[in-house]
Each structure stands twice: as structure tokens, then as C-alpha cells.
Amino acid sequence: MAHRIIAQNRGKGGPTYRAPSHRYKAALRHAGKNDALVSGNVIDIEHDPARHAPIALARLDSGEKIYVLATEGLGVGDTVSWGTGGTVKNGNTLPLGEIPVGAYVCNIEARPNDGGKFVRSSGVQALVIGKADDGRVGIRMPSGKNKWFNGACMATVGIVAGGGRGEKPFVKAGKKHFHVRSSSERWPRVKGVCMNVIDHPFGGGGHQHCGRPKTVARGTSPGRKVGHVAARRTGKWKK
């Protein structure tokens, strides 16, 4: 009798596929709200297993310590601020309505005071491209799409640190192994046609093709539901 395929194992949610959130340092949020001004000093730059971008440990004027997303050029000893009335400089967080057109921003809030949702990956940035009469601010996202935000949403001035991370090749399989192991990702990924017949519906047969139609119905039982699920059409488009 065949055992469960990888897709079924993944759906169970065991420790092999579960994100190691117990190793994450903190949920990164803006230190202040958009109706006040909070400032502090950067006391350390650290690595967080939850992300590829480095994070900064800041001590606020109140004595509280908080982790925030680091931007390029931010260093230990720098003074940063969050909230309305701050200076437009690298690392400071202000409402979008106070940031001039043409500035690079990151860690943008989707709604006012939600802590930051967009543009948080290493090396990415968005661009302030315009402001509307109703208070909205136009942002060009890293994808190239233009998106409008509430002018009260806060964003950090600058580019997320850690750019160019993907340019260095792994070279050796061992380095790739430890890289994916840190995020509980299954690696390497083996094609179904390369597996034994017990491991996948496309496996076995001593050949490198599935040997059956790849289209399966929406209501197909688990373990057989692989390939083109409920496909309207298959194959290449004719020019």
C-alpha cells in the first residue's frame, strides 16, 4: 500500500514543515504612532532568523528597547525618530504626507498605526511619486505597481538593508542545505517523475514522463490530486 506523498505530509503541519517561529527575535513594528514623536538611539545591529534583512536594536528616550527594521547606512549610535514632526532623513519614520515626492521609503503601513506591512524585504525600496488633494500619497512599489496610501500611514525613509544578498552564489550543496534548514524548508525538491511508484502518482516505470494524463478533477482523492488540478486547458498557446 502506498504511503502519503509529500503534499499530504506538508498539509499535516508537522515540525518538518513548520516555521521555526520560536527562534524569531521580535515582531518588527514602528516604535511610535503617527500623532506623536518618539526618538531613540541605535545600540546594536543584529541578525534575525525570521528574515534576511538585518534588524536594529534601538533604545528609546523612555529607556525601552525595541527591534526595528534597519535601513542602508544606519549604524550604531545613530539617532532615529518615529512619528509626526520628525526630520526627513535615513532611518526616520514619518507619516507619508510629510515625506517629499521623490524620496525612497520602506516598511509602509497598510492602515494608520498598524506597524508596517509593505516593502520589508532585504534591499527593496518604494518611491513616493505624488500626492492627491484628498490626502492620499502615491507610492511606486518594488513590483512597479503604483499604489495609493492614506497620508497618515507611516513609512521609514531609506532602503531596507541587506541588498545584494542573492547575488552571491551558494557554490556548494552543503551551504544550500544549511540555508534552507534554518527556515524548515524541504530541500532538495525532487520531480514526481523521478520518484518511485510508491512515492508519487507520476513515479516509476523506468522513464522520465508521467505516463498518464496530468489533468485531475477537483474532487480527486488526496494522494492522487497532483498535476493540473481542474485545468480549463493545457499545453502551449498557439501564436
Swiss-Prot record:
Keyword Cell membrane: no
Protein name: Large ribosomal subunit protein uL2
Gene Ontology MF annotations: rRNA binding; structural constituent of ribosome
Primary role: One of the primary rRNA binding proteins. Required for association of the 30S and 50S subunits to form the 70S ribosome, for tRNA binding and peptide bond formation. It has been suggested to have peptidyltransferase activity; this is somewhat controversial. Makes several contacts with the 16S rRNA in the 70S ribosome.
Family membership noted in the UniProt record: Belongs to the universal ribosomal protein uL2 family.
UniProt keywords, alphabetically: Ribonucleoprotein, Ribosomal protein, RNA-binding, rRNA-binding
One cellular component (GO) term of this entry: cytosolic large ribosomal subunit
NCBIfam families: PRK09612.1 (NF007180)
Top-level lineage group: Archaea
Region (Disordered): 205-224
Native source species: Methanoculleus marisnigri (strain ATCC 35101 / DSM 1498 / JR1)
Quaternary state and interactors: Part of the 50S ribosomal subunit. Forms a bridge to the 30S subunit in the 70S ribosome.
SUPFAM superfamilies the record matches: Nucleic acid-binding proteins, Translation proteins SH3-like domain
One GO term of the biological process aspect: cytoplasmic translation
